[in-house]
Regions:
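Short, solvent-exposed, charged loop/turn and helix-capping segments
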Residues: 60-82
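Amphipathic alpha-helical coiled-coil segments
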Residues: 53-68, 96-107
């Protein structure tokens, strides 16, 4: 029975690597959406939702791994030599998972800064639009007033 649990744990770690690879890919896609001014916001939203699904999957994998480990920890500890290869394989997977996690953290920090810059740009653009809108409204009001005034003068001259 412990052999089966250990095999499942190793399989779980490999699946976690695949999910982390997907998150790395999605982080790159997110960077592209943040740096492309023409990219619709929907694409960014889809990427965030896909990453959220991956994170949920990681949490499930972690939970399952921990439960299995709790059941075989004593067996692994007592019979280290019997499970040396499996332990080595798991350690290698854990190293790769850790490396990928570090890469993801760096990508997330970069994307957070890009997002901050993008929102600052959007804020500046919105401010400029409001300012231009007020200027156009002011121009329109002054034009209407002038036209109204000229129409009044013409009417007075006709009578």
């Amino acid at each position: 029975m412990p052999d089966t649990y250990i095999a499942i744990m190793l399989q779980s770690l490999k699946k976690k690597e695949q999910v982390l690879d997907e998150i790395i890919r999605l982080d790159d896609r997110q960077k592209d959406t943040l740096t492309d001014p023409e990219c619709p916001f929907d694409v960014f939203d889809e990427t965030v939702e896909a990453k959220s699904a991956c994170i949920d999957q990681l949490n499930q994998l972690d939970s399952g791994f921990e439960k299995l480990y709790a059941q075989v920890a004593e067996e692994l500890d007592q019979n280290r030599e019997d499970y040396a290869k499996e332990i080595r394989d798991m350690q290698q997977c854990i190293r790769r998972v850790t490396d990928k996690s570090v890469k993801i953290q760096a990508q997330e920090a970069r994307n957070k800064e890009l997002m901050r810059e993008k929102f600052a740009t959007i804020h500046r653009q919105a401010k400029a639009v409001r300012k231009n809108s007020r200027a156009i409204t002011g121009y329109y009001n002054s034009t209407v007033s002038y036209t109204h005034l000229r129409a009044h003068e013409t009417l007075a001259n006709l009578v």
